[in-house]
Amino acid sequence: MQKRAIYPGTFDPITNGHLDIVTRATQMFDHVILAIAASPSKKPMFTLDERVALAQKATAHLGNVEVVGFSDLMANFARDRQANILIRGLRAVADFEYEMQLAHMNRHLMPQLESVFLMPSKEWSFISSSLVKEVARHQGDVTHFLPDNVHQALMDKLK
């Protein structure tokens, strides 16, 4: 039986930290679904279609990654995709409490859904999409934190 995992997030935009997690997940699971949440309440900078396209290009070198957008409840999405593993990145202790609440709720909604937490590599442990966008808005150099295609899209968006 194939091990199918979902790595959900807003990915507004996808960063090298996200790529670190998804790349490592591809070594642990047969199929990884990078599930990009519509998240209209977060007022994303990039549309869902833009985020999906950026992530598809950034992960094209990974053979077992599928990038899809979604707006459903995560447990329902996982059930529909026949996945029973959720991958979540934990940057710091501050992330853990929220992630624990999500894991418990997801397990309540779908008892066979396991959450697997991965720590990003030290190089990426302090970055987030929000922080990268904020630095870029103030003309800070964020080249190191983003895949090339995403960096260009962010610069174009901020013009």
Swiss-Prot record:
CDD domains associated with the record: PPAT
SUPFAM superfamilies: Nucleotidylyl transferase (SSF52374)
Pathway noted in the entry: Cofactor biosynthesis; coenzyme A biosynthesis; CoA from (R)-pantothenate: step 4/5
Signal peptide: none
Name listed for the protein in its UniProt record: Phosphopantetheine adenylyltransferase
Family: Belongs to the bacterial CoaD family.
Main location group: cytoplasm
Gene name, Swiss-Prot/TrEMBL: coaD
Any one of the GO CC terms: cytoplasm
